[in-house]
Amino acid sequence: MNYYDALYPQLVAMGQERWAAQLQSTLSKQLLLERYGDMPEWLSALEALPQIQPSCIDLQDSVTIGSGSDLGRISSEELITLLQAFHPWRKGPYSLFGVEIETEWRSDWKWDRLLPHIQPLAGRRVLDVGCGNGYHGWRMRGVGADFVLGIEPFLVSVMQFQVMQRYLRDPQHQVIPIGVEDLPANLACFDSVFSMGVLYHRRSPLDHILELKGCLRPGGQLILETLIVEGDQETVFMPPGRYAKMRNVWFLPSIPAMTLWLQRCGFTEIACVNTNRTSHGEQHATDWMRFESLADYLDPDDESKTIEGHPAPLRAIFIATRP
C-alpha cells in the first residue's frame, strides 16, 4: 500500500508537477523501510488495527473518531495495546472509538488561542511545517481548509497520523516524512503556512522565515509560534548550552526582535496575537507519553526558570502577510 497516492494529484492541481514526481521517488515504501529501522514494526501495528467504520466524526470541536460501541467484539484494551505501539504520543488529544489518547501536549489549547486571530481557513490550501502527528491539520480540515499538507521529519509521528487516516480516509489531509529543508524553494502555492514550535530549533532563524515566505502565495498568511523572551528590539537570547534539557535550541527573540525579523524578511501586517507561559496542564507526562516532560524541565524550587536557570518557556503566536 502506498499511503501517498492521493497526495500527488493534489500537488499537480497546485502546479507542482515536478515536486510530485520527486516525492513519488523519495516517499517510496522501500526507501522508507531502508531509512527507518522501526518501520516494519509500525507497519505491522498499523495493519493490525481493526477495520471499523466510525459511526461519528468530529473535527470541529475536537478530534473524535467513532464511539466505543463501534468496536463490537474488539475490546478497548486490545485497541489500546495496538495504539501504544506508536508511543510516544505528543500532540493531541484524540478520542478513537472511545479510547481517550491523553497526549503530552494539549494541542487543542494552542488551537483555541490562535484560531480567532488568523484569516479564515475555509477553502484554503495550508502547509503545516513540523506538524507532528497532524493534530492541528485535522482541526484545520474541521474548519473547512480545502487541503492541508503537513511535513514532519519524525516517522513515529507520521505513523500516528496514518492511524487516524485509516479511519478518516481524508485525501485532503496528508502528512509526509520530510523536513522544511527538503521543500523546493519558492513554491508560492499555499494560502496559509503554519510553523509552530520550529523556529527555535533552527540554527538560522531568518533563513527559516524566508523558507516559509517562499511557500506562500502573494497575499498568503504566515502563522508562526515560537519561544520568546522579554525585552526590546535588541534582545535575543541564545542559550550557552541546553535549554529546558533541549540541546537544539538556538535563538529566542523578544516580541520586538521577532517583529523586526519578520519585517526584514519582507512580511507586512505583522502582529503578535498571543503570549502564553507553558503550564503543567498543557504539557505533562501521561500513560501515552512516558518520558520526561515540563515538570522535569523546570527548576523545582522556582518554576519561573528552567532547570538550567534560564527564563521558563514563554510562547508567542505571530501572524504576518506575504505582500
Swiss-Prot record:
Homotetramer. Pfam families: Methyltransf_9 (PF08003). It comes from Trichlorobacter lovleyi (strain ATCC BAA-1151 / DSM 17278 / SZ) (Geobacter lovleyi). It catalyses: carboxy-S-adenosyl-L-methionine + 5-hydroxyuridine(34) in tRNA = 5-carboxymethoxyuridine(34) in tRNA + S-adenosyl-L-homocysteine + H(+). Its EC number is 2.5.1.-. InterPro entries: CmoB, Mo5U34_MeTrfas-like, SAM-dependent_MTases_sf. Carboxy-S-adenosyl-L-methionine binds at K91, W105, K110, G130, V180, E181, M196, Y200, R315. It comes from the Bacteria. It is an enzyme of class 2 (transferase). The keyword tRNA processing applies. The lineage of its organism: Bacteria, Pseudomonadati, Thermodesulfobacteriota, Desulfuromonadia, Geobacterales. Belongs to the class I-like SAM-binding methyltransferase superfamily. CmoB family. PANTHER family: METHYLTRANSFERASE (PTHR43464), TRNA U34 CARBOXYMETHYLTRANSFERASE (PTHR43464:SF95). The keyword Cell division does not apply. NCBIfam families: PRK15068.1 (NF011650), tRNA 5-methoxyuridine(34)/uridine 5-oxyacetic acid(34) synthase CmoB (TIGR00452). Catalyzes carboxymethyl transfer from carboxy-S-adenosyl-L-methionine (Cx-SAM) to 5-hydroxyuridine (ho5U) to form 5-carboxymethoxyuridine (cmo5U) at position 34 in tRNAs. GO terms for biological process: tRNA wobble uridine modification. Keywords: Transferase, tRNA processing. This is tRNA U34 carboxymethyltransferase. One of its GO terms (molecular function) is transferase activity, transferring alkyl or aryl (other than methyl) groups.
